Amino acid sequence: MTSRLPFLVNRPLLARLDREWQVLNHRPAVLRRARGWGLGVPFVSLDEVVAAAGYRSGTPAGSGTPAGPAGATEQPAAAANEVLRRLLLAARTDDVAGRVVLQRLLPGVIARARRWGVHRVGGSSDAFDELLSATWMVIREFPVERRSHCFAAALLR
């Protein structure tokens, strides 16, 4: 008889990421810094930047994915892609821009960790840790110049 591996992601790490996001989200110094990235969209919180980069709220309650920004409106795909492109350019040298991109990608990273985790000895917790680390490196080094569309999908490959 075979046992099914745990189907959970690293909850403590997700909780730390969530606490970090809550601290950064409305901090005036962080928002001033973000306005220097030339995103071309107005915002009063980093949640609004994530929404402008194409994040779509509406994930099922209790799914373990971050809640969508309150009151944020969905951007057309081309506009969202351009915001994400500019964030990726800023993320090469700015950790906060990289953190915004990571927040945009977290639901996809969590979903992939859950899928991969059932096949791993360490479960989805280990898969999430590894994917998060790899995602950060990809965000910081993504070759924006070689791609013109679908940045979020390319980042999650």
Predicted regions and their residues:
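Sigma70-family region 2
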Residues: A90-T93, R112-R120, L132-F151
